[in-house]
Amino acid sequence: MIINKFSLKWMLAIAVAIPAIALLFVAFTSLNTMSVMQAQSNSLYANTAAPMRAMAEATSRIPRMRVGIDMMLLQETALKDAKGVLKRVEEARTEDIPEMRQAMQVAVDSQVNPELKEQARKLQARFEQMVREELEPMLQAFANNDMTTAQNIYRDKYAPTYGEMRKQANQILDTLLQQAEQQNHASVESFEAGRTKQMVIIAAGLIISFITSLVIITNLRSRVAYLKDRMSSAAANLSLRTRLELDGNDELCDIGKSFNAFIDKVHHSIEEVAENSKELATMASSVSQRAHMTQSNCASQRDRTVQVATAIHELGATVSEIASNAAMAADVAKQATLHSGEGKKVVGEVQNRIQTLVNELDNATQVVSSLATQINGISSTLDTIRSISEQTNLLALNAAIEAARAGEQGRGFAVVADEVRTLASRSAASTEEIQQVINRLQTESTRAVEAMEKGRSQSDVVVEFSAKANQSLTEINSQIDQINDQNIQVATATEEQSTVVEDINRNVEDINQLTTETSHVADELSRASASLQRLSSQLDKLVGSFEL
């Protein structure tokens, strides 16, 4: 519709302008009618009031003059008055005739209509003729007391002329009255025409205004109903595919365009949220796998730690046995001369035991080194977990921002994003705690390795001394003092080894405890990843409720 090309402001302006224009036309018509009526009224006044008053004055003097003449005629009868004939003749000449002339001249001058002016002039000329031919002779006869002549003139000339002049004057008055009636009728017709024109303009303005307003209101109602239905449908179905298609340039089209832009942005945001949710689910699954792997590695490490502890306990028993044997060797040294052969066997046994100790120390060193390697692996895994936690936190922050943009519809998604961010923060904190434990575990592992190396060095020394003892058995009788010194050294070394073994045992127990804690952390991480997967699933459901 062409009306849709106008804005609401212009529609309302048109709806108001039409009756306003109609009112202007009514006002213009009223002013025009009033102007015409005023002109007609002025014309009626100019053509009627003064001319009729002057003509009426002149007409009224005609019978008054006759009354004066009649009174002259009655002076010969019983009806005579005190003035007498001569007095009345004088009054007629000095007053009645001049006043009649003046009235006739005023009547002629006051006429506006040329035809009436001409008739008034004829009446004036007839009066002058009557004065010359009838009144003057008749007045002269009255003055000469010639009543017979006066009566004859009165009867034969003046009376017919009087009737003729009365008739002419009445005709002029009738014409003036007809003219006034015509002008009044024209004024009434102008009034009726103006009123009819005003009624037509008012009716046309009202009809056009009603039709225009009806068209505007119907169009607005249909367009508003379309907006309401489409928006209600989109809100009820959570459809992000809904678009408002309105033609025109009014504000409703602007609302439709703004709504479409809003839906496009929300659609894009929900699609990004869906992609991020899938990526979050993948990361949660990866974190869960890493957590299970960490838990498995912790279990394996715990088993190996138990093995190391067992070996350390055996090493401690061996060291104790070496110490006991060293004490026995001190006693037996006194009898070395008699038991040199037996001493060789003892020395050989000592060598075997020491070699076993060396092997056990090597195994312990390998186990501890493997433990350090596993710890480094755990540290790398924790770095991965920390990176995942940071990415999860970042994704949760982005999700919260997008939820805030979504407004009321993204409130549930904002709660989910906040829960994900909280879990990511807890995972990061747990990762930092695990990192601290691993750092302590690495330190203790390093110390354990150093202690193992010292023990191995001492074992090498013992092996060397045992070899020398085996070689010196032939000289054992002469070197008993030296053997006693060596036994003392062996006792001292075994005591140191016992101390080192106890330290290693404690370190292994600490490692075992740390491994247990790491396993618990891995369990929590696994549960956190499961919760993250559950939240991701809920997020997918929320996203799935939208029609993309």
Swiss-Prot record:
Residues 276-512 form the Methyl-accepting transducer domain. Its main location: membrane. Keywords: Cell inner membrane, Cell membrane, Chemotaxis, Membrane, Methylation, Transducer, Transmembrane, Transmembrane helix. It is found in: Cell inner membrane. SUPFAM superfamilies: Methyl-accepting chemotaxis protein (MCP) signaling domain. It comes from the Bacteria. Pfam families: 4HB_MCP_1, HAMP, MCPsignal. Residues 32-199 are periplasmic. GO terms for cellular component: plasma membrane. GO terms for molecular function: transmembrane signaling receptor activity. It is a multi-pass membrane protein. GO terms for biological process: chemotaxis; signal transduction. Residues 1-10, 221-548 are cytoplasmic. The chain crosses the membrane at residues 11-31, 200-220. Residues 218-271 form the HAMP domain. Chemotactic-signal transducers respond to changes in the concentration of attractants and repellents in the environment, transduce a signal from the outside to the inside of the cell, and facilitate sensory adaptation through the variation of the level of methylation. Belongs to the methyl-accepting chemotaxis (MCP) protein family. This is Methyl-accepting chemotaxis protein HlyB. The gene is hlyB.
